Each structure stands twice: as structure tokens, then as C-alpha cells.
Amino acid sequence: MENRTIKIKSKTNNNVRINIIPGHFATNHSHVNYYIDMTSLKTSYRMARDAAGELAMAYAHTTHIDTIICLEGTETVGAFLAEKLGHHGSGINEGNDIRVITPESNANNQLIFRDNIQNKIRDKQVLLLIASASTGKTINRSVECLSYYGGQLAGIAAIFSAIDEYNGIKIASVFDVSNIVDNDIVPYITLSPGECTMCKNGDKVDAIINSYGYSKL
């Protein structure tokens, strides 16, 4: 499977890269034809820093942010994003000490925050940062959590996004489906398991994937 890997570079910074692997992959709520491998971007401080710089441009002059909620292993990017926004010379967040937090998942797979950190959310302007937005379900779950704890959604950012917006809110991303199209390869698709054309064609599932990585079958 790994021998099918294709390297994709950001359109604005050649130092920011992800790998994509074509195939048949299953998440817990959809089937997709690419595994988006962000391992290097999440673990390399240089690449995470540069990716954060790209995301910061979407908010630096327009959006007040008190807190960044990091999901799907984006904490390193989130910390650099807070730094970029807080130290942007002419930005709206200049001098702000932006908080960077991560929720827990309880036994029912609900996102929760403990009592000691809830004051970083209540009545705060919150940016959601996720690794991948494909169906919007992770975003929906996060927005419900944010609403429960009294936070205000200021924006949504992703490393990779297959969707342009969520309920009218534009999703800022480092990579999107156009990065795949620009490399003259098959477009990215996401389907519900019951409507998966790859399953109907008898193509076996290559791996189960989530934000941590993949497990080959």
C-alpha cells in the first residue's frame, strides 16, 4: 500500500507537505478513496510551524480568538498557530495570550472538558482546529460540545478539508481537494458505507483509518 504514496506540497509553501495514498479506506462513518497521511506535518516542528503560518493568515486581521481547541492530533500546529496570531505585528490578536486546549472523549464518545478548563471556553471566541474535514461530522460533534460549554465559534481550520464550509462558516485549510486535482490524479471522494461504489465493485478495503493513522486489513 505504501508504494502508492504520492507527495503533495502546499500551493504557497513547498516546505509544507502531506502524503496521500490512493485505495479503499474505511473510517467509522464513511469510505474514502485516499488516506491523507499527515504524520510528518504533525510531528515535524518546522512543518507544523509553517502550516500554522498559512492558517494564521486567514484570521490575523479579521477574527478575534481567545482559545484554540485542537482535535485529531493538531496540538503542535495549534501551539504555533496561537503564537503566530498573538505575535502578528498588525493583527487583531496582537499581544493576546491565546489558550490551546484539547478535549477528552468519554465512554459515549462525547467530547468533554473538565471543570478546571471550562473557563477557557465559556464566553470565549474559539477556533476549532482539526486534522481532516471530509463529512463534517467531527466538526458537528465539536460545535455541539462548544455550545454546551458556552463558547462562541470564531472559525474552523483544518490541515486538509474536502468541504468548503460548515453552516455558512468558511473552513480555512492548508490543503483541500484542489491539491489532489492539480496533481492530475483521481479526485477525492467520500461516501457512506452503504453507497460506496468501491464496495459495490468488489474492491477490498485496504485499511481502517482514523486521526491516529491506519491499520491494514
Residue ranges and their predicted role:
Residues E75-L127, S134-N140:
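Short, glycine/charge-rich flexible loops or terminal/linker lids adjacent to PRPP-binding catalytic cores
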Residues A60, R114-K120, P187-T190:
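Short amphipathic alpha-helix with an adjacent loop that forms part of the alpha/beta core around
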Residues M57, E83, H87, E144, ...:
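Short, well-ordered alpha-helices that flank and scaffold nucleotide-derived cofactor binding pockets
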Residues E2-I8, T12, V143-L217:
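PRPP-dependent phosphoribosyltransferase catalytic core
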Residues M1-H64, S211-L217:
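Active-site-facing substrate-recognition patch
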Residues C70, L128-L129:
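Hydrophobic Val/Ile/Leu positions in short beta-strands of Rossmann-like dinucleotide-binding domains
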